[in-house]
């Protein structure tokens, strides 16, 4: 049986996470910032245009357990914020309307 579009999307998210993780299956701060710059340049540019430095403190906000690493659930929380912003854009909101989360 072939993958559905939703299944392929979830697998793609897992692959994206693994592309930037270390041996411990976690992403450090430089890795997270690189992942955002590599994969969400339009989102970051929109935030910069609004004067919001999204990269300045996103790591600290998402590292809920303060272990200086981003685990998969913290990564999903970050992607959820970005996806929510894109969803709001689909309803006419400006880009990076929630970029300072």
Swiss-Prot record:
| Residues reported to bind Zn(2+) | 18, 25, 87, 91
Question: Which CDD domains does the annotation name?
Answer: S-100 (cd00213)
Assembly, per entry: Interacts with RANBP9.
Q: Name one GO molecular function term.
A: transition metal ion binding
Which annotated residues bind Ca(2+)? 63, 65, 67, 69, 74
* Compartment list: Cytoplasm; Secreted
Protein name, per record: Protein S100-A7
* Organism listed in the record: Equus caballus
